[in-house]
């Protein structure tokens, strides 16, 4: 059976502006905030968004491919996977934004057999080539509604 792929951006998907504002206020008040997981003292994810992502992977068996700047060549994919409690199967060549990211995803799909895929990325520019397979959290990051759409697409139940 051909694998399905979830192309994962992190910033804007597993965190968003309002999350960073809330985290910043917690840090100013020197309070820990269990709503967030901090990666190497600078980056973070929102725990409820991370749980939604983990459920997508569990329910679909998809392989996670990094497209975020978190996956640049200087960072260890296994370490990021451990932090997210997910297996990261790889990353595209260009983990910066813009058309380079889009072209890297297209190249990956051309070079790897697949049944279904989802591009989970808040970047709008260029990703229109993926049609319905581009799930674009706009302001709130990953939501339950977007999670269900990802699951349906990855299972081939939404075309």
What are these regions (language model features)?
Residues 75-159:
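C-terminal cap/substrate-recognition subdomain and adjoining C-terminal extension
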